[in-house]
Amino acid sequence: MNKFLQIFLFQFMFFGYSQSESIKLNDQVDQLFKVWDTNNGPGLALAIIKDGAIVYKKAYGIANLEYDIPITPSSVFHIASVSKQFTVFSILLLEKQGKLSLDDDIRKYIPEVPDFGKKITLQHLASHTSGLRDQWNLLSMAGWRFDDVITKEHILKLVSKQKELNFSPGDEFMYCNTGFTLLAEV
């Protein structure tokens, strides 16, 4: 069965979950995710939360294939671009509450962003059309490695030193993590 279909079915199954069905739930979850419980591919850590309490947690598969290190329920994962949807959702909630506008200039919230003579809006940042250089490209050129600890202060410093844009805001699309670091700050 397709893994994405399995996840969908799992979500569908969970909506009808009650506390008295915990053993049945455990068996159903194990059955659904056993495809990831191997030593030859990455896996996952899973927690099911109901009414603010963890009702199920388990790990499946391997965290580090090279060293055969298993995933545990407390394994930490790099969330990466999965966070972008939550960042934009948060910005849209703030807009709905009247606390900001997608047309606001990022410099209104983060004055460290240089004035490039062109307004960079929150919309530009959220849609990868800001023209800013990507933070990971800049970091790698500066000798940083992907597994180095990188703080928002590091990113803001990189952005503040940027001399020009790759293109005028809104004119082109270029995937840019920098925009989401800035949106997260807002």
Language-model region placement:
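Bacterial Sec-dependent N-terminal signal peptides
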Residues: 1-24
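Short acidic/polar alpha-helix capping motifs at helix-coil junctions
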Residues: 4, 16, 56-57, 146-150
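Generic marker of residues within folded, mature protein domains
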Residues: 8-10, 36-38, 69, 115
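Short N-terminal segments immediately surrounding and downstream of signal-peptide cleavage
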Residues: 20-38
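Residue-level detector of alpha-helical secondary structure
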Residues: 31-35, 50-51, 90
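A short, well-structured edge-of-sheet supersecondary motif
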Residues: 37-70, 102, 152
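Active-site-proximal loop and beta-strand segments within enzyme catalytic domains
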Residues: 62-177, 181
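Well-ordered alpha-helical scaffold segments within catalytic/enzyme domains
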Residues: 183-186
